[in-house]
Swiss-Prot record:
Catalytic activity: carbamoyl phosphate + L-aspartate = N-carbamoyl-L-aspartate + phosphate + H(+)
InterPro entries cross-referenced by the UniProt entry: Asp/Orn_carbamoyltranf_P-bd, Asp/Orn_carbamoylTrfase, Asp/Orn_carbamoylTrfase_sf, Asp_carbamoyltransf, Asp_carbamoyltransf_Asp/Orn-bd
Free-text function comment from the UniProt entry: Catalyzes the condensation of carbamoyl phosphate and aspartate to form carbamoyl aspartate and inorganic phosphate, the committed step in the de novo pyrimidine nucleotide biosynthesis pathway.
Pathway connected to this protein: Pyrimidine metabolism; UMP biosynthesis via de novo pathway; (S)-dihydroorotate from bicarbonate: step 2/3
Protein name: Aspartate carbamoyltransferase catalytic subunit
One of the GO biological process terms: amino acid metabolic process
The organism of origin for this protein: Gluconacetobacter diazotrophicus (strain ATCC 49037 / DSM 5601 / CCUG 37298 / CIP 103539 / LMG 7603 / PAl5)
PANTHER family in alphabetical order: ASPARTATE CARBAMOYLTRANSFERASE, ORNITHINE CARBAMOYLTRANSFERASE, MITOCHONDRIAL
């Protein structure tokens, strides 16, 4: 990858070749080559041989309207490993906090001649709106309860590294599905790749129409985790909840927390995943989070590799447009 001319960018993101806004509708024949590229970046990162000229002279702006140290840092590290100049903008330090509209921000960023724009926003659809207004390529780093595509891609890469494929696996996504953009992106990707997906949680945190996405719904952990290959726990997002959806953190853990007893009904060696940040003692027991079955730290590592691949491909797509 580090030698010779740069190849034309494969169109892994069919709806918006220059942007990554979501995973709905992405075809498996596009996902597998992307995961291959991300895997190569993971191997290069481990050997400290990343192509630092890949984004040389390019500017990446991380525009985060919501706090997220983990995701922002992952994108920043990915961009720097490819040689890009990186600027981090947060609401607290931007003109948005002084009344500037999103469209005003788009006009300002256009004037700056930004190459790649990584956006996190509390409102679903905000990255898509920016993508229509800016010349830069836009990456959705999480928008409201809509999607978080790079999280699902890194989850898929992590799973594939252990099983070799996603096809035929059974994955349980457990917890606060209603407020989770991670759950939605994973459902789109996993079902497209031939995995069977279950969603597990209290009725108050499972959307009524979720079955239309091709998933099975379970309201007890014992039923939902039986014979699954992967257990993906979700954070309880109290900041997005209305009152009364969950009685208390203690009650939630009592019925829906992942402990060793509940994990025992999954297949032997089932992977334990979590997008972070974890609430230990709420959705997951520390002994499970830190066990040999946990791949939570590996997810973080794969996140940098996936985001390197995304930034690389979108920069090449921008060259062709």
């Amino acid at each position: 990858m580090t030698d010779g001319p740069r190849a034309a960018a494969p169109r892994f993101f069919p709806q918006h070749a220059r942007h990554l806004l979501g995973l709905q509708g992405m075809h498996p024949t596009r996902i597998e080559p992307f995961l291959d590229l991300a895997e190569s970046y993971a191997l290069m990162s481990r050997s400290r041989k990343t192509p630092r000229d890949r984004l040389l002279g390019r500017t990446v702006i991380n525009l985060f309207f919501e706090d997220s140290t983990r995701t922002r840092t992952s994108f920043e590290l990915a961009a720097k490993r490819l040689g890009a100049d990186v600027i981090n903008m947060t609401v607290a330090s931007s003109s948005v906090n002084k009344g500037e509209t999103l469209l005003d921000t788009a006009a300002t960023l256009n004037a700056m001649r930004t190459d790649l724009l990584v956006v996190r926003h509390s409102q679903s659809g905000a990255p898509a709106l920016l993508a229509r207004k800016v010349e830069a390529s836009v990456v959705n780093a999480g928008d409201g309860t809509h999607e978080h595509p790079t999280q699902a891609l890194l989850d898929a890469l992590t799973i594939r590294r252990h099983f070799g494929t996603l096809h035929g696996l059974t994955v349980a996504i457990c917890g606060d599905v209603s407020h989770s953009r991670v759950a939605r992106s994973n459902i789109h990707l996993l079902t497209a790749m031939g995995a069977r997906v279950r969603v597990v949680g209290p009725p108050t945190l499972i959307p009524g129409a979720i079955g239309a996405l091709g998933v099975d719904v379970h309201y007890t952990m014992e039923d939902g985790l039986r014979d699954v290959d992967v257990v993906m726990m979700l954070r309880m997002q109290r900041e997005r909840m209305s009152g009364g959806q969950v009685p208390s953190a203690r009650e939630y853990f009592r019925f829906y927390g992942l402990d060793r007893k509940r994990l025992a009904v999954a297949r032997p060696g089932a992977l334990v995943m979590h997008p972070g940040p974890m609430n230990r003692g709420v959705e997951i027991d520390s002994r499970v989070a830190d066990s040999d079955q946990s791949v939570i730290r590996e997810q973080v590592e794969m996140g940098v590799a996936v985001r390197m691949a995304v930034l690389d491909l979108l920069s090449r797509a921008g060259d062709q447009s």
